[in-house]
Amino acid sequence: MPAPAATYERVVYKNPSEYHYMKVCLEFQDCGVGLNAAQFKQLLISAVKDLFGEVDAALPLDILTYEEKTLSAILRICSSGLVKLWSSLTLLGSYKGKKCAFRVIQVSPFLLALSGNSRELVLD
């Protein structure tokens, strides 16, 4: 009597994560522009507000870490607002009359993934 055929079931979870995490960096054309964490968050919110309006600017957005020296941050955004935030940051071109650009360095649904970069890995 032959053994019963094994059955396999493929399960795919599409975006089960509630939040996404973004590592971003703000670059100015002219050096010497500084922002504190509150100004940085206000810039993020105003970028979304300018592109998508008041309602979408109310998306839950948190700054988990912020470095004033490098103007870089790790952001937490609800997954449904990821594309809106990303496109808003991409299209932002100036802050208080000074030209600037956001660079999205990494994006992941897992915060741990942003802790290291395999491209900068140095093996002993």
Swiss-Prot record:
Keywords from the UniProt entry: Nucleus, RNA-binding, tRNA processing
InterPro entries xref list: Pop5/Rpp14/Rnp2-like, Rnp2-like_sf
Source organism, top-level taxon: Eukaryota
Pfam families documented for this protein: RNase_P_Rpp14 (PF01900)
One Gene Ontology biological process: tRNA 5'-leader removal
GO CC aspect terms: multimeric ribonuclease P complex; nucleolus; nucleoplasm
Further remark: This protein is produced by a bicistronic gene which also produces the HTD2 protein from an overlapping reading frame.
The family this protein is said to belong to: Belongs to the eukaryotic/archaeal RNase P protein component 2 family.
Role: Component of ribonuclease P, a ribonucleoprotein complex that generates mature tRNA molecules by cleaving their 5'-ends.
Name of the protein this chain belongs to: Ribonuclease P protein subunit p14
The organism of origin for this protein: Homo sapiens (Human)
Encoding gene, per UniProt annotation: RPP14
